[in-house]
């Protein structure tokens, strides 16, 4: 979930802050949707700033159900749903794979370079039943997902005591065979008012879930690349594991053991005391516990074709935290003036524990607990970590309005985080907003027949982000290093004690219109966000011995608009038809980087001044050379057209249809080897055009962020029966498909390309192909 673009480079800090019943949570995965009564999204800094440092990417406020005064009400709900693949990845069938094998064989026989597969004749033998099948692996490992959910709730109460209890069970059978998810959760909400001046309440949530999964990346790779004519079973009926270097997806699905048991518990208690009709005090206390226990076993059948050693994993992750928040509120109304002042303090602490055990080659494939691997632990991968993180805050808010017509809201929050050194531990996050309900002005009386409410809003605020490692500001060392069988301590991270808060300044201008007794409502917003002190990994020279260090690397902006329209098309006693539409656009720009230096984030993301977050970085093709002679360019790198007659090159070139007599240049690899027919014609960016294709010729080839997003929803209601339809759209934005890239790069003989590539690849001189020759050769066609 992203709100108003991306305001940080940090992967941990891109998500919004979740507030559930007043409690900030890192995740809402364990919440039963049937427990939710309302959800509110805070987008602008003025409304989000009260939540401080973690609200730079917006705040989602969730309120769960509470009991109502009256007799106990019991509700039972059951829901069953189905799920299918929304898009099936095209896979080559047996005929297409044999065609590809033939193409490669003919290519090597014609151009040399080695045998593509010395056993190709055996593998393609139509009389050998083991290789005479036509598998659609995706169909073989997938089916219709089945989802069941049951909820039983009871709620009610008296004037003093109200309660709500819900127990839910969710069971999902995954689309991929032998995968699934189960969840059992209970929520107990209660509110108690023993006197007129005291209120208290509790929110208790308990969740247990069990996930049965697989290594989706490895499985997808096997599905897309394994030859379709390889049988999945041997003639004796036993299951094939790894054959010809390729894993059998059926064996992976049926023999891999991967269970994750998750335990979550959240306990929230509040106390509220009213000193008089103006002044009240509230204390919030929360404790949260989260435990993950994962057991995984890769049997010897699918781990290695020759050594056949199984591999076991055990992961234990514990996260618990507590929070205390104390708030004093004063509210007063004097004639037409409404005034509220609030001041509070907050403290929160987290503790993280992680244990990892990896074992190799146990005596059985049926015991996945680590005692089976006790004699063969992989010490380089086995270990444990312990870390802590704490925050302290003080905050205040003042609100004022005159007749509800002129509105003012001011907030100041000061947060301290243990993730920064003493000098930069504290961050200040102020905000202010004003509003004008112009529909209440005398000069707007003429609009009362159609305009019920009209308001203009403006706000400015600063929010922060501290989503980095718990100890990134200090040097770290590891005692787990082993070299030549001898243990030792090595430095693992360079500290930076001048790390500071990432700050996002946001200006927002909004308009709210309500027509004909809420028959039509329109909300429009324009925002401008500017982030300073971006926290990211800064690449270091190799001579330092470290890959990177955490630092404040630059600045970034996000600008855009949001429009939402909701209307009741039909509103009668029995019939109601409501429709809503929203659209938003965000423009992101990296304004500044340290020393103006661009750098790679991961394998594909390119960060540069003037660029955008989500830019893909790679080589861009201008097509495929039809002939060896097509690799011909002018001194200005304009491509020339070779002249052929009856298939024979005439040693002539054309430029814009006219014979060219100037100097001829070629594109080459760094070693001087020229590109040939069937190779990609790689483009070169302005300023690097020298004809030598190397890493300097990579450029931005796309972006993952959409240009426009939005939704369309409609609900038709007749008495107590309703029909809801919802649509979400995203325009622009691209996806980097690593699996598609890997299977279509021709690097490995056994890899099966997509059908589109097989039917549109270059095979003979003169082919006007989309894809290159069926042989990988460095930059030529990778």
Predicted regions and their residues:
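Extracellular/periplasmic, surface-exposed regions of secreted and cell-surface proteins
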Residues: 15-17, 148, 183, 189-208, ...
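Conserved small-residue
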Residues: 75-77, 81-128, 356-358, 551, ...
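Phosphoinositide-dependent membrane-docking surfaces
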Residues: 33-42
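Membrane-proximal, glycine/serine-rich, low-complexity loop/turn segments characteristic
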Residues: 1-17, 25-28, 46-272, 338-339, ...
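Non-catalytic regulatory/gating segments with a bias toward low-complexity or hydrophobic composition
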Residues: 22, 39-40, 60-62, 563
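Outer-membrane beta-barrel transmembrane strand signature
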Residues: 122-155, 160-166, 237-274, 376-397, ...
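Conserved active-site-proximal loop/helix segments of enzymes involved in bacterial cell-wall
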Residues: 536-539, 691, 741
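C-terminal beta-signal and adjacent terminal beta-strands/loops
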Residues: 84, 140-141, 449, 589, ...
């Amino acid at each position: 979930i992203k709100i108003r673009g991306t305001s940080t480079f940090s992967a941990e800090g891109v998500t919004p802050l979740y507030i559930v019943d007043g409690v900030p949570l890192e995740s809402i995965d364990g919440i039963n949707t049937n427990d939710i009564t309302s959800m509110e999204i805070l987008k602008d800094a003025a409304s989000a700033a009260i939540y401080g440092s973690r609200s730079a990417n917006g705040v989602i406020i969730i309120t769960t159900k509470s009991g109502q005064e009256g007799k106990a009400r019991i509700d039972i709900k059951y829901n069953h749903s189905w799920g299918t693949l929304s898009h099936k990845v095209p896979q080559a069938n047996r005929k297409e794979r044999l065609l590809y094998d033939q193409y490669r064989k003919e290519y090597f026989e014609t151009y040399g370079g080695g045998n593509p597969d010395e056993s190709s004749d055996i593998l393609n033998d139509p009389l050998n039943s083991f290789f005479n099948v036509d598998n659609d692996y995706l169909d073989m490992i997938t089916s219709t997902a089945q989802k069941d959910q049951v909820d039983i709730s009871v709620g009610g109460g008296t004037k003093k005591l109200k309660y709500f209890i819900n127990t839910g069970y969710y069971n999902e059978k995954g689309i991929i065979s032998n995968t699934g998810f189960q969840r059992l959760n209970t929520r107990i909400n209660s509110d108690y008012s023993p006197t007129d001046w005291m209120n208290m309440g509790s929110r208790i949530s308990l969740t247990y879930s069990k996930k049965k999964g697989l290594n989706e990346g490895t499985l997808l790779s096997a599905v897309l690349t394994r030859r379709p004519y390889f049988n999945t079973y041997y003639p004796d009926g036993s299951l094939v594991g790894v054959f010809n270097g390729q894993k059998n997806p059926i064996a992976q699905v049926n023999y891999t053991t991967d269970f994750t048991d998750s335990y979550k518990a959240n306990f929230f208690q509040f106390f509220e005391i009213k000193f008089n009709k103006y002044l009240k005090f509230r204390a919030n206390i929360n404790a949260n516990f989260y435990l993950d226990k994962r057991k995984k076993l890769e049997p010897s059948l699918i781990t290695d074709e020759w050594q056949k050693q199984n591999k076991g994993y055990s992961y234990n992750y514990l996260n618990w935290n507590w929070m205390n928040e104390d708030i004093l509120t004063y509210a007063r109304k004097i004639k037409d003036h409404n005034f509220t002042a609030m001041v509070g303090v907050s403290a929160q602490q987290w503790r993280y524990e992680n244990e990892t055990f990896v074992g190799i080659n146990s005596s059985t494939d049926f015991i996945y607990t680590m005692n089976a691997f006790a004699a063969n632990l992989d010490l380089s991968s086995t270990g444990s970590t312990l870390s802590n993180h704490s925050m302290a805050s003080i905050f205040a808010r003042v609100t004022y309005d005159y007749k509800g017509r002129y509105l003012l809201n001011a907030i100041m929050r000061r947060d301290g985080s243990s993730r920064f050194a003493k000098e930069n531990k504290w961050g200040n996050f102020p905000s202010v907003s004003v509003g004008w309900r112009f529909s209440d002005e005398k000069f707007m009386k003429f609009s009362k027949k159609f305009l019920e409410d009209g308001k203009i809003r403006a706000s400015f605020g600063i929010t922060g982000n501290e989503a980095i490692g718990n100890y990134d500001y200090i040097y770290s060392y590891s005692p787990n290093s082993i070299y030549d069988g001898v243990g030792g301590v090595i430095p693992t991270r360079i500290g930076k004690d001048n790390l500071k808060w990432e700050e996002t300044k946001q200006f927002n201008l909004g308009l709210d219109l309500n027509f004909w007794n809420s028959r039509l409502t329109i909300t429009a917003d324009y925002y401008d966000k500017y982030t300073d002190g971006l926290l990211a990994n800064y690449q270091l020279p190799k001579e330092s011995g470290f890959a990177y260090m955490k630092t404040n690397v630059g600045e970034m902006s996000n600008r855009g608009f949001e429009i939402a329209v909701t209307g009741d098309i039909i509103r009668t006693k029995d019939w109601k038809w409501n429709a809503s539409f929203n659209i938003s656009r965000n423009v992101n720009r990296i304004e500044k980087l340290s020393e103006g230096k661009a750098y790679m984030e991961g394998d594909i993301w390119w960060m540069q001044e003037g660029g955008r977050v989500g830019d893909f970085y790679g080589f861009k093709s201008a097509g495929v050379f039809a002939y060896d002679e097509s690799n011909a360019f002018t001194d200005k790198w304009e491509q020339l057209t070779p002249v052929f007659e009856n298939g024979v090159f005439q040693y002539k070139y054309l430029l814009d249809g006219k014979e060219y007599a100037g100097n001829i240049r070629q594109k080459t690899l760094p070693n001087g080897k020229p590109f040939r027919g069937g190779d990609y014609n790689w483009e070169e960016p302005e300023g690097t055009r020298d004809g030598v294709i190397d890493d300097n010729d990579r450029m931005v080839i796309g972006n993952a962020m959409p240009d426009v997003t939005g939704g369309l929803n409609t609900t038709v209601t007749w008495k107590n029966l309703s029909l809801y339809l919802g649509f979400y759209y995203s325009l622009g934005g691209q996806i980097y498909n690593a699996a598609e890239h890997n299977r279509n790069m021709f690097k490995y003989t056994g890899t099966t390309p997509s059908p589109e590539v097989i039917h549109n690849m270059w095979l003979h001189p003169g082919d006007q192909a989309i894809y290159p020759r069926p042989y990988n050769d460095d930059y030529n066609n990778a």
